[in-house]
A protein has these predicted regions:
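GST-like fold's C-terminal all-alpha helical module
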Residues: 3-100, 132
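A generic alpha-helix propensity feature with a strong bias for hydrophobic helices
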Residues: 73, 102, 111-115
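Segments of small-molecule ligand-sensing domains
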Residues: 105
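Acidic/histidine-enriched, glycine/proline-rich intrinsically disordered or flexible terminal extensions
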Residues: 108-133
Length: 133
């Protein structure tokens, strides 16, 4: 599955090196650049896939959308640009508008900073502190 073999791992690494390792004093510019660039490439693949489709597998919302959305939608947290990815951004809008998506975003607590709202730097520091050795 695209999410498990690509988007999830790459976005996860982009977030880790920027939001956990770097605030804890372990900055690795090559790793950050590598994972941000690969995450962008994968989001471009997804953007192409979404051309002419409402959802990843056609016009029906599916487990593929459910699994990929949280990772892809966290692009801001991973500092991955989604500029000019019109099909991807339209897909975000469709999924963001779903009532169950909004409900899920409140669990276990509201997390607006993950989606580019609020103070991302403060959220990153708080998150990184949970992973100190």
């Amino acid at each position: 599955m695209f999410q498990m073999g690509g988007v999830g791992p790459m976005m996860g690494q982009a977030m880790y090196f920027q939001r956990i390792a770097k605030p804890n004093g372990d900055e690795e510019p090559y790793s950050i650049r590598r994972y941000v660039e690969e995450s962008r490439r994968l989001l471009e693949v997804l953007n192409t896939r979404l051309a002419g489709r409402q959802f990843m597998v056609g016009d029906e919302y599916s487990i593929a959308d459910m699994a990929t959305y949280p990772w892809a939608r966290s692009y801001f947290w991973a500092t991955v640009s989604v500029d000019e990815l019109d099909h991807l951004n339209a897909w975000f809008d469709r999924l963001d508008a779903r009532p169950k998506t909004q409900e899920a975003l409140q669990l276990p607590e509201p997390r607006p900073s993950a989606f580019g709202e609020g103070d991302i730097d403060e959220a990153a520091k708080k998150n990184a502190a949970n992973f100190k050795n």
